Amino acid sequence: MKDMNRKLTNRYLIPAAVCLLGICGLVFYYFFFSFSARPKTEYIYIDNNDNVDSVLAKLSSIATCHGIQGLRTLLRHSTYSKHIRTGRYAVTPKDGAFKIFRCIKNGQQAPVELTIPSVRTLDRLSAELSKKLMLDSATIYRVLTDEKICHRYGYDTLTIACMFIPNTYDVYWNISPEKLLDRMKRESERFWNFKRREKAKQMGMTENEVITLASIIDEETANDAEKPMVAGMYYNRLKLRNAEYPNGMPLQADPTIKYAWRRFGLRRIYNNLLHIDSPYNTYKNVGLPPGPIRIPSVAGIDAVLDHVHHDYLYMCAKEDFSGTHNFAHTYQEHQKNAARYSKALNERGIK
């Protein structure tokens, strides 16, 4: 009798076990086996316009057949369609459909590396940032040119660029405009540590003024080693007080003329360009322009804070086109340097 019961048990138990193993194998195959058909990590972007079908369509281009079938089953039999989370999601070669499902359902994003570019205008900044974010350039530009929003962070629309310190930051692709500005404000405060703030204070300059001067330095030279020297020359002009210049010597910085005209490709600045009525015209106006003419590099900012102490008041690009400058104490010396450079430009046919 016992042998008969054992036989009956084995008769049903073994097939059941085989079926169970088969089911487990299928579950593993569809939900836990490698989802991606690609050998490296891929990323998908889910935005506000997506639904279950479009999400599956985006993933199907990188998925195995069993992987996309498994994910489709999970998405169809869950509440995912009621709350689709935007974001940038990583799909690694080892991830199964179930892990992908959990990531996109719970909003477990992979951050993007957002590099703040050294651009000249807010519209260009907006365009460059939008290339890495879900935000479009028009939305970013609208925020950056909103006086109330700028004032909330301690700036105006002419100085808001001062808050963007060039670096690479990890942010989420679907970051909101407010959170983006909050992050930039925190990074700016982190950059302006006690040491840098003290240096600016000793120079009698605000952080925005330092950044504005740094933007001119960066436009004048790409040579980081020379930037402290150039900064020292412009600082001398800012602080000069005598009978001829009771309020300071005009900076007469050619890059500000390019900015005033929005003609950034100019190779030479002629006298007819110097009469433009603009607060950025440092030939007509004494002191710094009302805001930076580009987002300056960290090297440019530190060049201002650590400027070389000398008594030069003039500089002119060297005639060898090395990207460096000849410095002069007097206008007469400067005219000689300028004549040599002008001759070199003419010889090369640069107009």
Predicted segments, located by residue:
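N-terminal start-of-chain detector that recognizes signal peptides
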Residues: I14-C19, S61-A63, T86-R88, T139-L144, ...
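Pocket-edge positions in alpha/beta enzyme catalytic cores
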Residues: A16, I44-D47, T92, Q202, ...
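Intrinsically disordered, low-complexity regions
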Residues: M4, I23-L26, R88, Y155, ...
